[in-house]
Amino acid sequence: MSRRTAQINAPLSRRLKGDPIPWLLEKEDPGARYLAMRDVLGLPAEDRELHLARRQAHAHGPIATVLDKMDRSGYWVQPGPGYGPKYRSTVWSLILLAQLGARVEEDRRIAKATGYYLDNALLEGGQISSSSGPGGTVDCLQGNMLWALTELGCDQERLQPAVEWTARSVTGEGISPASEKDAPRRYYASKCGPTFACGANNKKPCAWGGVKVMHALAILPGRNPALVRRAIAQGAEFLLEGNPRPGGVPQRVGQPAER
């Protein structure tokens, strides 16, 4: 550990007033210790010390707190697709668990929760919905949950319909306009068109939803199929076509430029 820490310390010391690594690795905060070992030190998944830290992070701290509030059926606060109430229900609990580094291998309750969520929110067409129908899908939810479920270690075969819909919804391949009500695969009032078009954004491309979709597509394991690669290329072109610092992306009238 000390040699690896030394390798990290040199570039950090030029930017910071002190070395944060020893503080991040303190055993009193197992969650922060685990994430620092994984993301800052870059220890491989098979590293014994990292494995022990991950186990401790699941037994104590925020991961354990979130899991202790889960209903035995696999949901938080109320049954169903779990979008509300913000920010305590199933959607937000799963996102938080993913951000904290939780994994299905470490606690059977995580597998229970991801299975329950997919049973209630993933539709046959691959849409991840806030309601019981495909009209409840939107890029920010789709991207957030595909990312979270992938990070948590959810079975990729189970997620494949969501991956395909996510990629197609960006490129528009094989998806009919919302007006074609009888089409087997179409856009809807909220998810209304390709390149992150969103009904809540006056049907214009939404960079906030787009970032979440790109985040999800970027971490898919293995070699991406051509459809996913095309979606990533199209999404990157949209997000990088202007200066990201001032923004300038389409947004609803009356909404703040920075959010």
Protein language model regions, located:
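Preference for long, amphipathic alpha-helical scaffolds in soluble/luminal domains
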Residues: M1-R259
